[in-house]
Amino acid sequence: MTKKIGIEQSLSDVEQALKQKGYDVVMMKTPEDAKNCDCCVVTGLDSNVQGIADTSTQAPVITASGMTADEICSEVEKKFH
C-alpha cells in the first residue's frame, strides 16, 4: 500500500522528490488534511502554523528546516522502516 505523505504548500521541491520515490503526496492546507496521512512534512518556520502538531493524527511529523529534498526523503523512509 502506498504511503500518504502530507506536506506544506511551500515544499514543492519535496513534493516532486517524494513522488519520484513512489509516495502519494497531498498538500496540507488545513489540520484536517493531516489526519489521514502516514507522515507529515512541515517547514518548521512556525512549527504549528497550521495546527498540524495539535491534530489527532498519530503520524510522525518531520520538520524540513535546513534540510534538502533528498534529506527529507531519507527521513520519511526512516519513519517506515
UniProtKB/Swiss-Prot annotation:
Entry's transmembrane regions: none
Pfam families: UPF0180
InterPro entries from the UniProt entry: UPF0180
Domain of life, source organism: Bacteria
Family: Belongs to the UPF0180 family.
Alphabetical list of HAMAP family matching this protein: UPF0180
Name of the protein in its database record: UPF0180 protein RBAM_013970
